[in-house]
Amino acid sequence: MTERKTQIVVVGGGAGGVELVRKLGAKYGRARHDIILVEKNRTHIWKPLLHEVAAGALDANLDEVGYRSHCHRWGYRYFFGTLESIDRDNGQVVLAPLLDEDGAELVARHAIRYDYLVLAIGSVTNDFGTPGVTEHCLFLDDRAAADRFRNRLLNHCLRVSREMTVNPAADAHVRIVIVGGGATGVELAAELYNSAAALRHYGLEVFDESRLQVSVVEAGPRILPALPARPAAAAHAELEALGVTVLTGVRVSAAEADTIVTADGG
């Protein structure tokens, strides 16, 4: 009689989840343990790099890791799908139906048995229930969101470049508001200016960083609150030297299609 393997299911293939299945696979292998990763994306990219993907400074295809090749190397199995529910009584996770781009079902809803279950689903941006944010704002939570931001940025830059070609005196700008002065917001603001300076070499001859208007809005008294005051102040000064408008002590109360509304009515 074949001995039943101990089944360890890890849901979420972010930095924590993918490192866990790698270590479990390396330590236990496939002989007596069945290690399974459930992840809704096909590739992994380190989340702190998403601002570089969004700004166009990093080609994610060169830095991402494909789960299928990674699982083969490290001794675990990969299930492409999204967690729908957990059946604790029967020791199962239920994966939602897998649909294609047209909404047709590829894989029906199904369950995976577990002896040990690890939820490593990570975090997502909190919109704090602010009206209009879900409808009108972009979030840097994953590779797909970073790609959407980059594509929208390039489209706006192309529009401004074309407008300036037709009318060199046009007051055309790409305006970006970044809500949150933490590490991601600050790094994204700086990277946007670096990327804008390079666009002229990629077909947008009349576009440069002077046509970019970036604002960082932070509700707290200063940006980079996790850092000591001195390096945070230095980063603030560097952003302003690039041309970034840094607003501290400002809380966003609503978002509209082409503007944000602050609590003080600005």
Regions found by a protein language model. Give the residues of each.
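A conserved beta-strand/loop element that lines the FAD pocket in flavoprotein oxidoreductases
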Residues: 75-87, 240-255
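Beta1-alpha1 glycine-rich phosphate/pyrophosphate-binding loop at the start
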Residues: 2-85, 183-227
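Conserved N-terminal Rossmann-fold NAD(P)-binding element of oxidoreductases
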Residues: 11-12, 119, 179-180
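FAD-binding core/adjacent interface of flavoenzyme oxidoreductases
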Residues: 1-5, 76-177
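Short, well-ordered coil/turn residues at beta-beta hairpins
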Residues: 96, 120-121, 248-250, 263
